[in-house]
Amino acid sequence: MASEKKLSNPMREIKVQKLVLNISVGESGDRLTRAAKVLEQLSGQTPVFSKARYTVRSFGIRRNEKIACYVTVRGDKAMQLLESGLKVKEYELLRRNFSDTGCFGFGIQEHIDLGIKYDPSTGIYGMDFFVVLERPGYRVGRRRRCKARVGIQHRVTKDDAMKWFQVKYEGVILNKSQAIV
């Protein structure tokens, strides 16, 4: 009976809080709406548009112009999309893909690698995956009433995130010199 119980503390287990899929087109108009359609097809949710913060004349971008779209996915759908995204990357990430706060991100070149059928009218879009990891109890930092800080011992660190990735997905973490592009 005792051997069946987990010896690890359930409050220390790391889980995916959310997955953010981002497609940055760099211009508003038809290409951006087609990119939004790709995200909606992939996630089943309506994407949100991001605006440019300031004007960049060399790129032809004006301030407050819609230039990108993103969607935030949580729960089982997030795990499913993350699995398919990591499969495209062959479960290999660089060490620099992980942040100090325990989050990680990566990009893919073509959205059709995720299993969406190619549509000539839509085209092919690359996208970024951003994964936010947390432990149970992180709500104390987000709640409205009696807000508190998450303790240093309880926060997810870069090493924790890399270890979680290696154990959960049997992933490989490469240094910059090992990466073959």
From Swiss-Prot:
GO molecular function: rRNA binding; structural constituent of ribosome
Pfam families the UniProt entry points to: Ribosomal_L5 (PF00281), Ribosomal_L5_C (PF00673)
Main subcellular localisation: nucleus
GO cellular component: cytoplasm; nucleus; ribonucleoprotein complex; ribosome
UniProt KW keywords: Cytoplasm, Nucleus, Ribonucleoprotein, Ribosomal protein, RNA-binding, rRNA-binding
Cellular localisation: Nucleus; Cytoplasm
One of the GO biological process terms: translation
Gene3D superfamilies: 3.30.1440.10
Family per record: Belongs to the universal ribosomal protein uL5 family.
PANTHER family, A to Z: 60S RIBOSOMAL PROTEIN L11-RELATED
NCBIfam families hit by this protein: PRK04219.1
Protein name: Large ribosomal subunit protein uL5
Species for this entry: Medicago sativa (Alfalfa)
